[in-house]
Amino acid sequence: MIRAFALDNARLVSLDENSPDQLNDAVWIDLVDPSEDERSVLKLGLDQTLAEELELEDLEASARFFEDEDGLHLHSFFYCLDDDDYADIATVAFTIRDGRLFTLRERDLPAFRLYRMRARREKLIDSNAYELLLDLFETKIEQLAGVLETVYSSLEKFSHVILDGKQEAESLNQVLSDLTELEDISSKVRLCLMDTQRALSFLLRKTRLPNNQLEQARDIMRDIESLQPHHESLFHKVNFLMQAAMGFINIEQNRIMKFFSVVSVMFLPATLVTSIYGMNFEIMPELQWDYGYPTALCMMITAAITPYLYFKRRGWL
């Protein structure tokens, strides 16, 4: 799918048609999982070659940030959710050429939806491709900050549940699963922050940005630097709560094992009495007693009650 946007009074307006003439007027061309026909339209109309899927997934810096005859290229990670609502990251390829911004991605992303909504109302300052690129990065950082706030709120809730110490092992297992998911979210946010920092560093080194965009890029870098310590504290808190949950689960399991161990020891004397009188020897005087059976029962009960009272007194039960 191709979305093309032109400028009208310093605001982005969507172009209804994707003909070569219309695309020539566009300042931003946004492509979501384009077909071969759509790639051909760009190649024939604007002489623009798009990155392939394998190129999008390349992690080498030289393959993610470079400049060639097709323009300036940046490949950046964006946070999103997969089809099962689990944290995921998607790669977006940015290309700036002839004053036009091209964005290529395989799925729709929240940061892009939010920016399109804002762009309908807010005017651009310099109305150039670099401003669009930095606005998208700015929106991404705002989204990541919102994700970190959500993680913080969830951690506060889980910390009360865990440190209360009254939850059963089954409930703590669910909390542990949720904490693992939060750790995954946190790690993906960290990856996006670091990747954006690398992209901006490349942009500042390799291009002569206009003054307003230069200051905007530096502001975004400062925002990233301010989020990183906050992210680190959340990451440490996730690990602390996971260890605390594991500790309480181990305590609960040890309590159960302790109970069964004490019970098994408590019945050992009674089992000994039963074993003695269960032997099949011919000469066992007690077997001839009239009260041998009730006497053996009393001995077994006494042998069971005595350890129980002792363990109870010691606080082991």
Swiss-Prot record:
It is a multi-pass membrane protein. The keyword Ligase does not apply. The record marks 254 as: Essential for ion permeation. Coiled coil: none annotated. GO terms for cellular component: plasma membrane. The chain crosses the membrane at residues 259-279, 291-311. It comes from the Bacteria. Pfam families: CorA. Keywords: Cell inner membrane, Cell membrane, Ion transport, Magnesium, Membrane, Transmembrane, Transmembrane helix, Transport. Belongs to the CorA metal ion transporter (MIT) (TC 1.A.35) family. PANTHER family: MAGNESIUM TRANSPORT PROTEIN CORA (PTHR47685:SF1). Homopentamer. In the absence of Mg(2+), interactions between subunits are weakened, and dimers, trimers and tetramers can be observed in vitro. The central ion permeation pathway is formed by the first transmembrane domain from each of the five subunits. Mg(2+) binding strengthens interactions between subunits and leads to the formation of a symmetrical homopentamer surrounding a closed ion permeation pathway. Low Mg(2+) concentrations trigger both a conformation change within each subunit and a loosening of the interactions between subunits. This results in an open ion conduction pathway. In addition, this results in a less symmetrical shape of the whole complex. Mediates influx of magnesium ions. Alternates between open and closed states. Activated by low cytoplasmic Mg(2+) levels. Inactive when cytoplasmic Mg(2+) levels are high. This is Magnesium transport protein CorA. The lineage of its organism: Bacteria, Pseudomonadati, Pseudomonadota, Gammaproteobacteria, Pasteurellales. The gene is corA.
